[in-house]
C-alpha cells in the first residue's frame, strides 16, 4: 500500500482505506445487494502498451463464484514499467474501487477513477465511518444553497438511478444538463468547486492543485445537474460536467447504502491528451 499512498494525498489514501474497510464489513455480512452495475469495473488488465486507453475492462474484484468482497480482493497493477519518460499507469482497486493514476513525465492524471461505497455508513473501532460522506453532504449543501429559480434549472425532470458514464463508457460524451455555473453566485461557484475537490483531491496535492486551477478556469462552461430529493438523507443523484470533467454521484437503484461515483476527463482519460503530444 506504500506505493498507493505515495501517489495519493493523505485524504485520498484515507478515503481508499475507508472504502476497503467497508468492503470488509460487507464481506462479514455475507455480501450485499447488487443494484446496478458493480463498482470497480474500470480497471483494465495489464496491456502491452502504456499510455493510451487500456483494453476492455474486467469486472471489479471478481473471481470464481462471482464478485468477491474484502481487503484480500484488492489488487495493485502497473500498465507499463515506471519510467520518467515513457507513459505508464498505476492501478489499484477491486470491488467498489478503481484508481487509475497515469504518469506522463511529471504529470499525474487520476481519470477515470471510480470510488464507491457499500455500506455507505458503518462502525469501526467505535467510530462511524462514511467513506463518501463528504461527497453526499457537500452535494446536498450546494443544491440547497441555490434559490428556488436556480433549482428549477438544476433539477432534472426525470430520475437518474445509476451512473450515466460509468464503467465501459470511455470516450463517450453526453449533452450537458442542469444549470450553468456561470449563473451561480461566487459563493455557490466556490461550493461547486469544493464538491469537485472531493474527487480531484484524491490525487497528490501537486497534481490536484493544477487540476483544480483547470476546473476553475472552465467554470463558465461547467454545468451542475441534480435528480431526486433535495433533503439530505433521501435519494439523489448529481453530476458536474465541464469541458474537461465529468463527476457523477449515484445511489444504486435508490439504495442509500450502495453508492457509486465516477470521475472522468473526456479529453484526457488515461492521460490520452498528454500521450498524444
What are these regions (language model features)?
Residues 2-277:
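A cross-kingdom marker for long, charged
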Amino acid at each position: 500500500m506504500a506505493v498507493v499512498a505515495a501517489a495519493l494525498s493523505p485524504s485520498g489514501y484515507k478515503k481508499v482505506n475507508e472504502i476497503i474497510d467497508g468492503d470488509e464489513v460487507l464481506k462479514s455480512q455475507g455480501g450485499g445487494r447488487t443494484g446496478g452495475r458493480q463498482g470497480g469495473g474500470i480497471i483494465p488488465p495489464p496491456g502491452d502498451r502504456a499510455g493510451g486507453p487500456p483494453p476492455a475492462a474486467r469486472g471489479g474484484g471478481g473471481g470464481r463464484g462471482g464478485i468477491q468482497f474484502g481487503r484480500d480482493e484488492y489488487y495493485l497493477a502497473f500498465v507499463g514499467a515506471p519510467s520518467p519518460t515513457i507513459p505508464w499507469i498505476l492501478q489499484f482497486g477491486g470491488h467498489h474501487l478503481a484508481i487509475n493514476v497515469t504518469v506522463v513525465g511529471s504529470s499525474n492524471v487520476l481519470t477515470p477513477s471510480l470510488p464507491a461505497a457499500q455500506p455507505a455508513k458503518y462502525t469501526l473501532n467505535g467510530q462511524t465511518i462514511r467513506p463518501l460522506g463528504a461527497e453526499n453532504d457537500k452535494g446536498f449543501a450546494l443544491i440547497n444553497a441555490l434559490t428556488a429559480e436556480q433549482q428549477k434549472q438544476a433539477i432534472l425532470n426525470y430520475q437518474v438511478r445509476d451512473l450515466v458514464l460509468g464503467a465501459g463508457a470511455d470516450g463517450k460524451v453526453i449533452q450537458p444538463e442542469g444549470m450553468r455555473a456561470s449563473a451561480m453566485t461566487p459563493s455557490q461557484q466556490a461550493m461547486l468547486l469544493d464538491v469537485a475537490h472531493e474527487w480531484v483531491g484524491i490525487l497528490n496535492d501537486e497534481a490536484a492543485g493544477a487540476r483544480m486551477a483547470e476546473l476553475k478556469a472552465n467554470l463558465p462552461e461547467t454545468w451542475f445537474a441534480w435528480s431526486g430529493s433535495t433533503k439530505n438523507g433521501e435519494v439523489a443523484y448529481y453530476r458536474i460536467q465541464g469541458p474537461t470533467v465529468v463527476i457523477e454521484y449515484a445511489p444504486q437503484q435508490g439504495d442509500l447504502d450502495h453508492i457509486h461515483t465516477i470521475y472522468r476527463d473526456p479529453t484526457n482519460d488515461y492521460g490520452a491528451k498528454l500521450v498524444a503530444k
